[in-house]
Amino acid sequence: MTAKWEKQEGNKGVLTFEVSAEEFEQALDQAFKKVSKDVQIPGFRKGKIPRGIFEKRFGVEALYQDAVDIVLPSAYTKAVEEADIFPIAQPSVDIDQIERGKELIFTAEVEVKPEVKLGEYKGLEVEEESVEVTDEDVEKEIENVRERHAELIVKEEEAIENGDTAVIDFEGFQDGVAFEGGKGENHSLEIGSGQFIPGFEEQLIGKKAGEETEVTVTFPEEYHAEDLAGKEAVFNVKINEVKAKELPELDDEFAKDVDEEVESLDELKKKKRNELETNKKQEVENKKREELIQKASDNVEVDIPEAMVDTEVNQMVREFEQQLQMQGMTLEMYAQFSGQDEDALKEQMREDAAKRVKTNLTLEAISEAEGIKPSEEDIKAELEKMASMYGAEVDQLVQMLGGNTETLENDLKVKAAIDFLAENSKTK
């Protein structure tokens, strides 16, 4: 294999590579075996035509395309390895020379991963944030626990107050015409939750069970349904039932009911304080790392190829699809609900995708500059962790990955680069 790489403008270049005459001849042999199975010539059984007769009738050139299809994928892969380049998109390949008995010569226009010129990334400064948890924080968390364990008690005659839950039937009209998605029955609505359109919940305050009322609202300009965005609508609302929250008494029994690991309210407060401190430390550390990554990325000079952004956008769409599936939705259902098709979604994601690409390129460049490489032990530990998550053996997981742990190794390099940024940062 002879490969030659000529870099051109931007992130593109031309890769010239050859396949030996011997390899080309072997590919022609394979091509003949494939093609001859379907060739019918008088005097010969189908698939039994001699090679010489075939070539005399059709010419050896009839085998060229199939031979190229056979030899090109592996030849291109070897050429990429020899030239030590990292393609980011499918190449445009031309045949420069194809003749039996001679080398097969290809040229490929290839777009490659861009060069990254690192700026300052060591000793970056970040604000030091407090991880202190106050008594007020603990009391607020305890109140949240009380809220989660509250009982809903039916209010017979009392009017709706903020924080109550109203069970309602409703139907919305625009210019006197009912609109799609604007109707519901026995819907439980917590007043003050912000679950409905702004202004809707407030207009129910003071009403009682059994009453019917009209609620007039204006849909937000950014509302997902374009035909309703910014428009006024009137809802006919029937209040079927009103429920009020009854919070449990704040005592030792409450503490034991909500957490079997504690024996008193003081123990529950202590445990919640420890949990809050752990979470606060993690939040502060995560924020610090995100800030360091952003600063290092801002200091980088790189020409981001559109092909890499396209790939990242597609990945983001797949991730979004998985999130929708967890909610029992499909991308098509989301498009109908939001009025935003896949192309519009991709365009919306494009800016974030470009940022993600730049961030990854930055972290990869830092890992290269600092010689950061995961050890065999690191890779094994990560595989064991992943296998445990999927309930599989490590060997099974490696098989699922097609025997290729390159993506996993790259992820570990990126994580290690983030650790490096954090370990070499300063606080101010």
Swiss-Prot record:
Keywords attached to this entry: Cell cycle, Cell division, Chaperone, Cytoplasm, Isomerase, Rotamase
Molecular functions (GO terms): peptidyl-prolyl cis-trans isomerase activity; protein folding chaperone; ribosome binding
EC top class named in words: isomerase
Catalytic activity from the UniProt record: [protein]-peptidylproline (omega=180) = [protein]-peptidylproline (omega=0)
Subcellular localization: Cytoplasm
Source domain of life: Bacteria
InterPro entries recorded: PPIase_dom_sf, PPIase_FKBP_dom, Trig_fac, Trigger_fac_C, Trigger_fac_C_sf, Trigger_fac_ribosome-bd_bac, Trigger_fac_ribosome-bd_sf, Trigger_fact/SurA_dom_sf
GO cellular component: cytoplasm
Enzyme Commission number(s) of this protein: 5.2.1.8
Keyword Transmembrane: no
BP term (GO), one: protein transport
Cell division found in the keyword field: yes
Residues covered by the PPIase FKBP-type domain: 163-248
PROSITE patterns from the UniProt entry: FKBP_PPIASE
Domain characteristics, as noted in the entry: Consists of 3 domains; the N-terminus binds the ribosome, the middle domain has PPIase activity, while the C-terminus has intrinsic chaperone activity on its own.
Family, per entry: Belongs to the FKBP-type PPIase family. Tig subfamily.
PANTHER family: TRIGGER FACTOR CHAPERONE AND PEPTIDYL-PROLYL CIS/TRANS ISOMERASE (PTHR30560), TRIGGER FACTOR-LIKE PROTEIN TIG, CHLOROPLASTIC (PTHR30560:SF3)
Role noted for this protein: Involved in protein export. Acts as a chaperone by maintaining the newly synthesized protein in an open conformation. Functions as a peptidyl-prolyl cis-trans isomerase.
HAMAP family hit by this protein: Trigger_factor_Tig (MF_00303)
Name under which the protein is recorded: Trigger factor
Species per Swiss-Prot/TrEMBL record: Oceanobacillus iheyensis (strain DSM 14371 / CIP 107618 / JCM 11309 / KCTC 3954 / HTE831)
